Amino acid sequence: MPITSFEFIKGYAQSKVAKGETNDCVVRALAVVEDCDYDTAHRLAATRMRRANRKGVHTLTIVKYFDCEREKYELVKTESNPYKTPMFVHHFIVEGKALKTTYKLKGKEIKCDMTLGTFAKRYNRGRYFVVVRGHALAVVDGQIIGNNDDPTRTRRPVRFAYEAKRATH
């Protein structure tokens, strides 16, 4: 029997808060990337991202949160994002664009949107908070964690992603 994405979220099955929640993809992705339980991530989203119960989080609010947490997270750099700045992310959100990647076809380089599947293959080490249009999820060591259908919906373009920096002790 395959492991569901919810099994990767600490305390999700036992959480009374989770049972009544909807539109909580940001909370679940935070729980996985922060390596904390669901209730802690729920409180974090409520206090730091002003998330109301059963409501989603605006994309710009997510960007502002991660911009304030620079010591813990780093914006993922790709061919289309050489500067790693929040303004770049803001531009892509406003323009509705996705991260780009290149591949070779018959000797020619072709630039295209980076899909969730390509992102998971390319960034197969580490913890990433990933945003696609209207949804947030986590990619941990190349494994897509979010809704139960997220691992099968890999053709969605990635808008932006943040990598959790490794703690140095």
Regions found by a protein language model. Give the residues of each.
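Active-site nucleophile-adjacent alpha helix/oxyanion-hole segment immediately C-terminal to the catalytic cysteine
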Residues: 1-72, 76
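Low-complexity, intrinsically disordered short peptide segments enriched in small/polar/basic residues
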Residues: 3-6, 14, 107, 127, ...
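Generic hydrophobic secondary-structure signal
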Residues: 27-33, 41, 130, 137-139, ...
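Noncatalytic regulatory segments and standalone regulatory/sensor domains
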Residues: 144-169
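Conserved active-site-adjacent core of cysteine acyl-enzyme catalytic domains
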Residues: 49-134, 140-142, 147-149
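Short linear sequence elements within intrinsically disordered, low-complexity coil regions
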Residues: 11-13, 17, 108, 165-167
